[in-house]
From Swiss-Prot:
Location in the cell: Cell junction, Adherens junction; Nucleus
Name under which the protein is recorded: Wilms tumor protein 1-interacting protein homolog
Entry-linked PROSITE patterns: LIM_DOMAIN_1, LIM_DOMAIN_2
InterPro entries the record matches: Ajuba-like (IPR047172), Ajuba-like_LIM1 (IPR047245), Ajuba-like_LIM2 (IPR047247), Ajuba-like_LIM3 (IPR047248), Znf_LIM (IPR001781)
Role this protein plays: May monitor slit diaphragm protein assembly, a specialized adherens junction characteristic of podocytes. In case of podocyte injury, it shuttles into the nucleus and acts as a transcription regulator. Plays a role in the regulation of cell morphology and cytoskeletal organization. Acts as a transcriptional corepressor for snai1 and snai2/slug and plays a role in regulating neural crest development. Involved in the organization of the basal body. Involved in cilia growth and positioning.
Biased composition (Polar residues): 204-214, 223-233, 240-261, 272-292
Lineage start: Eukaryota, Metazoa, Chordata, Craniata, Vertebrata
Amino acid sequence: MEKYDEDIALQASKFLEDLSLCDGHSRLYGPVGDMLLSNDHILVADHRGRRLNGSLTQYLPHSSSDKVYPLGSSQLRSMNGSRGDGYMDEGIYKSDVALPCYSGISEKNKRYSAELYRHSCGNSFEGVPISAKQGGITALYSGGKMSNSCMSATSPRSSMASSASSSQEHSKYSSPRSSISSNALSLDKFSSPRSSLVVPGQQEKYTSPRSSLGQYEGGVLSPRSSYASTTSDTSKHSSPRASLTSYDCGSKPSSNRTSGISMGYDQRHISPRSSTASQYSCTTSPRSSYSDSRYVPSGNPDLDGVGGHGSLVSPRSSMCLQEGRSATLGSCNPSVVSPRSSISSHSSRSSRSSRGSMGAYTDLTVPSPRSSMLGTSLQEETLVQDLGEACHYKVLTQSPPRQEQHQTITSSHDLNSGAVASYNFSSAKGSATVHRFKLPYQVTPSRESGPSQAERRLEALTLELEKELELHMKKEYFGICIKCGKGVYGASQACQAMGNLYHTNCFTCCSCGRRLRGKAFYNVNGKVYCEEDFLYSGFQQTADKCFVCGHLIMEMILQALGKSYHPGCFRCVVCNECLDGVPFTVDVENNIYCVKDYHTVFAPKCASCNQPILPAQGSEETIRVVSMDKDYHVECYHCEDCQLQLNDEEGRRCYPLEGHLLCHSCHIRRLSVNVPPHQPPSYPMHVTEL
């Protein structure tokens, strides 16, 4: 079936050649023997034919002597897909603007019309207006020999049209609604009427009136799928919602909503919204801001004559940066820059284009009248060999530029356009070298990881301001730091240890400098160490030994009376109670006692009751009565006979008799038995306090 369709296409093309209404071979060439295109052969579209966002009206052909009119007067189809009156009975639509195909050899002395059939999904559509004017830019196209004409058709609504030469004789046509035209290598591939990307192969290629990009060989995918990988050699129709097609000689049906399918080989398409195209991509994002193009062949080595690869710069492009890395004989690569592209980088060995970014084909550039900055030497050289000889392309990547015998042909028949495209052709034989153009631009260097210098400076200034604010703020005064001798302000700066006041930054480990506020520390010979340095750095050799047990004190230390103790070893020798945090006392032999046991052992005893005289409850003072060189409790110092409390008052004084405590009355009574001739003298009472 495919072969049958192929034969029908061949017969149809031959039939159109025989019915061509174009003039003969004599008007194609000028008086010079070389192939110089006449200005009358430049086909332009009426500037009033379309608006950027309006409806499409009928295109008026240029009023030149070599007009090419369609077979029937018809009107272009409207943009909403409705069929106009111009459709024929057979479903073939005639376009008002056609591309004249200029033959370059004697065997084909005819100029063919572009009234060609367009097939899409089994339906025939209109022929494509090959030449269109966007913003006053004129496109020039020419053909090759043996029907190997490479025609690049730019739609009035297309942002970019690119084509590649081929020795095949099959024609591939995209849908009128396709964004990008695509044709495969050997089989007829028909894209969906709503496909978003159609990539022309190595045959004659015609882009749709709504095509955004004509790219190299490949299939067609749905406009709503992100990626589709095609590796089949057979002809398969993809989904009408496919977005992008990988070009591996065919197309496979892809999912309608595929988010990501990996591509085969090195020919990959970038997502329609990616910012930068990879170096192996052929089609960049329609909204990418910059695209670099590499590793894509630029021409067909079998083409002879002047190639029809022109480079069109969009009217609103800001900068067109072009790098010529190869020179071709009789062929130029077309590059159409998007209307709002910022920088377009062109390389003759690559082709990358985006609807909103750039188009990359070099060697012939038509500057835009609205472009902000274009290279001064964007008109590149092309050498044309004699018509009868076979032409071979030699790619020179980095050869020194040279120029030979230029002839300039300026296209002048441009209606309502503000720009004239200049083309330089060289009649000399041999390989041509292309100038390398570099326009001045500045790229913001990538920032290293971490904060930038400005951010660090800002942080430093912020810290300085915070410190100044802290100094000026009124804070609580704690005292003088014992280490630095400066005042301590604020609770965050105060640290108390070993009974002294420090700044938080002053009380640090003398070994590692770590701040010890709120951490365990060790004081060794007046130096403070953190726990890690003290335990694991050999400082345990200098640690004190417990006075009681004789072991090293590795944890908390308790110092008393010039000696060091473990807290658990500091106990009363009588009751064995821990005296950590409890009042204690020692004897002359450095034995430790609690207060109670100390008084029990060392307190004076009452001569009356023979009990120790202890301090009163809640008091540390001991009150006792000393009489006749004896110690008495206050309550024990009374008369033994009448129990009268004795003191220094008159009538209560003590009159001892034979070692007994007696008052004056009781003393007389005991003496009345043996009345003495004289009254015995009384003894004074002394009250002492310990």
